[in-house]
């Protein structure tokens, strides 16, 4: 305890009413915020002799002074405590750092509406579906929507500039309303069905399509009927894969695991009886904090964070009971002005969802504890930053290396959750492009890598491109083409060099949205990205140098198409050497056995070009 703080003198002035207290250190910073039904009793407990809690001992040793605010009830104290915690972010409180806005799917208000990823203020007119738990869930949903409903996902500027259908039309992902390939009525019908699907009413969508298919068949419009049939089959396949509850309401299911100072709250967002998405939260927990405080702090901060747009259901199911559960229910209900209930003892579907959430929370904590500061942990952090809904198992990175366009080589290196997987590394000798054209080189390498990709093949979860937006766009276009028949496609990320090419200043660009962002220079996730990028660069340079040296040590003749070892030997023997071959005319070259007039012309042009 600070020598300037007189606890006994302070406690004599404290009321036994309900209220909130704020503890300050010598610098005037709030280091802890708490609430109490009886302030005098609660604050006296901090200054007992023989404190056995390490956290409390550390806290008390830094107290310089304490401010107290009285409230009408314990419920009011809970709400005020939460406000102060958000305001001051005290070091000894449990803190949920969840200040990111949540992503939505936007169905725009337009003559031909588009589906788009949206995060931030909802300024654009249209319908917003969500919020989704993370960006990965939105990207997966948009990828699925492209397969189910041929609605455009391009921005309005791109839409206005079209004079002919783009690649998405060729891939049957868009009906090309920009150039009149679909009637307004048919397009509007698909928009309505997509809207119903996003609201969770997939059975209604299927019923509508079945009726349309039967009507088209009766009118002998068999191609149209076949399109409806394929759409119905795709929708039914999706519906079968979704885990559905008999309870059609909305609820959040929270599984909690807390061990060795690491707490994980794994949330399943159940909407219309389906798992809408899931997300793990890791609040900052001071050492020796008890479970009840961790639970109470999370519930308050998660559901009363007014800065984040979030759909809050009336029902929350959580894996642990705690002392102030009913007070929390009342406080959140008052703050939200709606009914809010927290349940712990549940059966049937709720119990099944709860077991799943607890399993995920437990596994998350075990993983964090056992792989801290390892490659595995860096993968976990990268998944969180990229907001992926599934773990990363395989990452690949491409780079191009050449000297003034000579001997271009592309590298592809592979990382798994143990680090570099060198047995999977590949190099591609780049041929037939304008020397120094990195875009064409990247296009050739990516095309060769995924030319015959199949569902059971080695598909990376993340594909890094060492370069800027131009190279990333080329790679994204190829991936879109090659993966159109598959349910899975890699997430592309461009790694653009920072100012002065200094490590730690890289800009990362998402291939599907072209959103750019940066990570802190000391971020373990950035270190993982730098590792795979540097390894790709090293592997490309090594391959380029080997190829360049081999080329320079090889006869010029062997670089001419159609000239192999036999013809090379014949030319040198017949004409007397390389310089004589270079000086020979077409007529002289034709006299060499095995050399046609066309080949002679090719040799002549190549050696004198």
Swiss-Prot record:
Localization annotation: Cytoplasm
Pfam families, alphabetized: GIY-YIG, HHH_5, UVR, UvrC_RNaseH, UvrC_RNaseH_dom
SUPFAM superfamilies the record matches: C-terminal UvrC-binding domain of UvrB, GIY-YIG endonuclease, RuvA domain 2-like
Descriptive protein name: UvrABC system protein C
Keyword set includes DNA damage: yes
Subunit composition and interactions: Interacts with UvrB in an incision complex.
GO cellular component terms listed in the entry, alphabetical order: cytoplasm; excinuclease repair complex
Described function: The UvrABC repair system catalyzes the recognition and processing of DNA lesions. UvrC both incises the 5' and 3' sides of the lesion. The N-terminal half is responsible for the 3' incision and the C-terminal half is responsible for the 5' incision.
Protein's gene: uvrC
């Amino acid at each position: 305890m600070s020598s300037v703080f007189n606890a006994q003198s302070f406690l004599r002035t404290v009321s036994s009413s309900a209220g909130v207290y704020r503890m300050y250190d010598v610098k005037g910073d709030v280091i802890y915020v708490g609430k109490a039904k009886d302030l005098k009793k609660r604050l006296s407990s901090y200054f007992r002799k023989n404190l056995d809690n390490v956290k409390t001992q550390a806290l008390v040793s830094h107290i310089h002074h304490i401010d107290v605010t009285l409230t009408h009830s314990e419920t009011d104290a809970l709400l005020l405590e939460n406000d102060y915690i958000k305001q001051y972010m005290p070091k000894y409180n449990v803190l949920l750092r969840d200040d990111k806005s949540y992503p939505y799917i936007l169905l725009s208000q337009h003559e031909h509406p588009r589906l788009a990823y949206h995060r931030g203020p909802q300024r654009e007119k249209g319908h917003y579906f969500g919020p989704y738990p993370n960006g990965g869930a939105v990207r997966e949903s948009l990828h699925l929507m492209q397969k189910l409903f041929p609605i455009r996902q391009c921005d309005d500027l791109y839409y206005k500039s079209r004079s002919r259908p783009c690649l998405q039309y060729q891939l049957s992902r868009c009906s090309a309303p920009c150039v009149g390939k679909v009637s307004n009525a048919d397009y509007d019908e698909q928009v309505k069905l997509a809207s119903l699907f996003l609201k969770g009413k997939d059975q209604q969508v299927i019923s509508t399509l079945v009726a349309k298919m039967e009507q088209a068949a009766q009118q002998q419009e068999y191609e149209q009927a076949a399109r409806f049939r394929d759409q119905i089959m795709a929708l039914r396949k999706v519906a079968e894969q979704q885990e559905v509850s008999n309870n059609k309401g909305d609820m959040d299911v929270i599984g909690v695991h807390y061990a060795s100072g690491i707490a994980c709250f794994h949330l399943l967002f159940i909407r219309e009886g389906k798992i809408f998405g899931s997300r793990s939260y890791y609040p900052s927990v001071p050492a020796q904090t008890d479970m009840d405080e961790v639970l109470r702090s999370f519930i308050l901060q998660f559901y009363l964070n007014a800065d984040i747009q979030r759909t809050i259901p009336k029902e929350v199911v959580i894996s642990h009971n705690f002392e102030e559960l009913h007070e929390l229910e009342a406080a959140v209900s008052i703050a939200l002005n709606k009914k809010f209930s927290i349940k712990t003892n549940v059966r049937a579907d709720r119990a099944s969802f709860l077991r799943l959430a607890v399993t995920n929370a437990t596994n998350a904590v075990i993983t964090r504890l056992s792989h801290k500061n390892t490659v595995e942990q860096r993968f976990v952090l990268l998944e969180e930053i990229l907001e992926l809904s599934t773990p990363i198992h395989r990452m690949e990175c491409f780079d191009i290396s050449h000297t003034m366009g000579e001997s271009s080589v592309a590298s592809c290196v592979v990382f798994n959750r143990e680090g570099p997987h060198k047995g999977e590394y590949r190099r591609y000798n780049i041929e037939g492009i304008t020397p120094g054209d990195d875009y064409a080189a990247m296009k050739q390498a990516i095309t060769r890598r995924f030319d015959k990709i199949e569902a059971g093949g080695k598909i990376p979860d993340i594909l890094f491109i060492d370069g800027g937006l131009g190279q990333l766009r080329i790679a994204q276009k190829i991936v879109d083409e090659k993966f159109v028949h598959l349910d899975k496609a890699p997430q592309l990320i461009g790694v653009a060099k920072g100012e002065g090419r200094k490590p730690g200043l890289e800009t990362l660009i998402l291939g599907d949205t072209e959103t750019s962002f940066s990570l802190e220079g000391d971020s373990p996730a950035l270190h993982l990205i730098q590792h795979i990028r540097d390894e790709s660069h090293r592997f490309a340079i090594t391959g380029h140098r080997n190829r360049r040296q081999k080329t320079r040590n090889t006869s010029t003749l062997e670089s001419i198409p159609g000239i192999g070892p036999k013809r090379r030997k014949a030319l040198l023997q017949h004409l007397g050497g390389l310089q004589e071959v270079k000086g020979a005319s077409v007529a002289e070259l034709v006299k060499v056995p095995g050399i046609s007039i066309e080949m002679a012309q090719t040799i002549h042009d190549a050696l004198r070009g």
